[in-house]
């Protein structure tokens, strides 16, 4: 509500509270920068409708996923090519991580065990890829994404895709 504030950066990682903050900010003509993949992946398209109606911008951030991925997508389009795949290479992913298995790490770094688990079990990357799909109109190739265990050179990943399925 405060005058003199043009934009709000939402970074809580909480869906319900963060969405309430964003909606309230939009109601008061504040631009929004989302650094909260959980909000963007669940209600981001809805928030965009509210922002458009209010004449403000709702945007993701740069410097991390999915912002870096979106920059690559825009670059490829900008040089006249049509991107067929947007993906994210995850160095550590273990679908069996739980808040219990992550409790020690979370305590050591002063973080929430549930949030830390989402970084390791694939939850966070799923939100990030949903955001990219929403923003680009691309489709998620399959429920749960692909998640190949791949240790060769990144250029060889192209052999994993059937071009006709991507078009």
Question: What do these predicted regions represent?
Answer:
Residues 33-34, 57-59, 84, 141:
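Structural detector of well-ordered beta-strand residues that form the stable sheet scaffold
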Residues 12-28, 35-64, 72-75:
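Rossmann-fold NAD(P)-binding glycine/threonine-rich loop
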Residues 1-2:
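Conserved N-terminal Rossmann-fold NAD(P) cofactor-binding segment
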Residues 66-69, 126:
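Amphipathic alpha-helical transducer elements in NTP-driven molecular machines
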Residues 74, 79-167:
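Active-site-lining helix/loop region of Rossmann-like oxidoreductase modules
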Residues 6-10:
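N-terminal Rossmann-like NAD(P) cofactor-binding module of classical short-chain dehydrogenase/reductase
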Residues 38-39, 63-66, 89-91, 147:
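Short acidic/polar capping segments at secondary-structure boundaries
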């Amino acid at each position: 509500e405060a005058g003199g504030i043009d934009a709000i950066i939402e970074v809580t990682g909480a869906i319900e509270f963060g969405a309430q903050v964003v909606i309230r900010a939009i109601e008061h003509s504040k631009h929004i920068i989302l650094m909260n993949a959980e909000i963007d992946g669940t209600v981001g398209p809805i928030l965009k409708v509210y922002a458009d109606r209010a004449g403000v911008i709702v945007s993701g951030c740069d410097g991390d996923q999915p912002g870096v991925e979106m920059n690559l997508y825009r670059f490829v389009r900008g040089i006249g090519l049509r991107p067929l795949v947007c993906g994210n290479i995850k160095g550590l992913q273990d679908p069996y991580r739980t808040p219990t298995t992550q409790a020690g790490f979370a305590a050591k770094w002063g973080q929430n065990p549930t949030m830390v688990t989402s970084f390791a079990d694939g939850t966070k990357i799923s939100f990030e890829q949903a955001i990219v799909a929403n923003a680009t109109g691309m489709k998620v190739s399959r429920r749960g994404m692909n998640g190949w265990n791949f240790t060769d050179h990144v250029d060889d990943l192209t052999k994993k895709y059937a071009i006709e399925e991507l078009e």
